[in-house]
A protein has these predicted regions:
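Short C-terminal domain-edge/linker segments immediately following a structured domain
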Residues: 1-2, 43-48, 153-162
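…; additionally, a secondary subgroup of soluble metalloenzymes is captured
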Residues: 5-8, 19, 25, 167-168, ...
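Glycine-rich loops and low-complexity Gly/Arg-rich segments
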Residues: 37-41, 149-152, 187-188
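Generic recognition of well-ordered alpha-helical segments
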Residues: 87-94, 162, 179-187
Length: 188
């Protein structure tokens, strides 16, 4: 056990602002954007190829980055950008997985953050309450993959954080991540 090597009386606290949950599926989102006509390639991509190597930026109107949620960037301006954003939001909100209906949430960053900084995406998508991992690679027969494009990984973030401690009552469910500072002040 990892704690056995620690000096006697050592206490350990593990805190995460997000929890963990089982991965239900993997979506090659750029593959889907290409099927829908929003993303174009300079040449036919190889299986699992990153989009940077093959995307035709002049003819593409949307491209996505993956992770535990998707970030979609619109390559258009004015009314065209508004229309593309509206259409993607509509399609992604009702997107179904091979196993059936999934809950997807599509946001503009300003809907989630008081202040949007840096090079923010135009849309952010949470697929199936973070149970479906969006990846940015392309070259697949289907946008729905059997597993993660970067190797084995069967879990994803969840919305609720967690904490674990070697002391006290770790069964509390009403604690917030910001409560950790006060908790540490009491025990240190």
């Amino acid at each position: 056990m990892p704690l056995e090597g620690l000096p006697g009386g050592t206490e350990v606290l593990v805190v995460s602002d997000h929890g963990n949950q089982a991965q239900r599926g993997v979506l090659a989102l750029n593959q889907l954007l290409a099927e829908w006509g929003f993303l174009r390639f300079r040449r036919e991509p190889s299986r699992g190829e990153d989009i940077d190597a093959v995307v035709d930026w002049e003819r593409s109107v949307a491209v996505a980055w993956g992770g535990y949620y998707a970030r979609i960037f619109i390559n258009a301006a004015g009314e065209e950008a508004v229309d593309v954003k509206r259409e993607l939001r509509r399609r992604l909100s009702v997107l179904k997985a091979p196993w059936g209906h999934i809950r997807n949430a599509v946001f503009e960053p300003a809907e989630l953050y008081r202040e949007v900084r840096g090079d923010a995406p135009d849309l952010m998508v949470y697929f199936d309450s973070l149970r479906v991992r969006p990846v940015q690679t392309v070259g697949y027969e289907s946008p729905w993959l059997e597993g993660n494009d970067r190797g084995p990984d069967d879990s994803l973030h969840s919305f609720n954080g967690f904490y674990a401690a070697t002391w006290g009552d770790a069964r509390r469910k009403d604690i917030h991540a910001l409560d950790v500072a006060g908790f540490l002040e009491r025990v240190l």
